[in-house]
């Protein structure tokens, strides 16, 4: 798997920003088939940082109402919380 396809996008929520400021942890949406070793290698290669640990979570898609009677579902996705070493930082577009 190509490392550019492992990390899809960062998650920028209030909780994710607090984790970044307090614990130096960054949250990403990643490919569902990626494991922790692949995620660690992708983050270290793409952002030139040293990763201390990776925690992953499979998130189940919620049910939606599509039309008047039909039900649909959002896609399942995978979340990765990456902790960096001291002095490491990833420049995201959070200063816009």
UniProtKB/Swiss-Prot annotation:
Keywords linked to the UniProt accession: Ribonucleoprotein, Ribosomal protein, RNA-binding, rRNA-binding
Pfam families linked to this entry: Ribosomal_L23
SUPFAM superfamilies in alphabetical order: Ribosomal proteins S24e, L23 and L15e (SSF54189)
Gene Ontology terms: cellular component: ribonucleoprotein complex; ribosome
Superkingdom of origin organism: Bacteria
InterPro entries assigned: Nucleotide-bd_a/b_plait_sf, Ribosomal_uL23-like, Ribosomal_uL23/eL15/eS24_sf
GO biological process: translation
Gene Ontology molecular functions: rRNA binding; structural constituent of ribosome
UniProt key word Electron transport: no
NCBIfam families attached to this UniProt entry: PRK05738.1-3 (NF004359), PRK05738.2-4 (NF004363)
Name by which UniProt lists this protein: Large ribosomal subunit protein uL23
Lineage, opening ranks: Bacteria, Pseudomonadati, Elusimicrobiota, Endomicrobiia, Endomicrobiales
Gene: rplW
């Amino acid at each position: 798997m190509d490392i550019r396809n492992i990390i899809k996008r960062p998650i920028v929520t209030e909780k994710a920003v607090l984790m970044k400021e307090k614990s130096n942890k960054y949250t990403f949406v990643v490919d569902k088939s990626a494991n922790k070793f692949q995620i660690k290698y992708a983050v270290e290669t793409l952002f030139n940082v040293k990763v201390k640990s990776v925690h992953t979570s499979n998130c189940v898609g919620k049910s939606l109402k599509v039309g008047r009677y039909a039900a649909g579902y959002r896609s399942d996705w995978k979340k990765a919380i990456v902790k960096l070493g001291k002095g490491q930082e990833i420049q995201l577009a959070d200063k816009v």
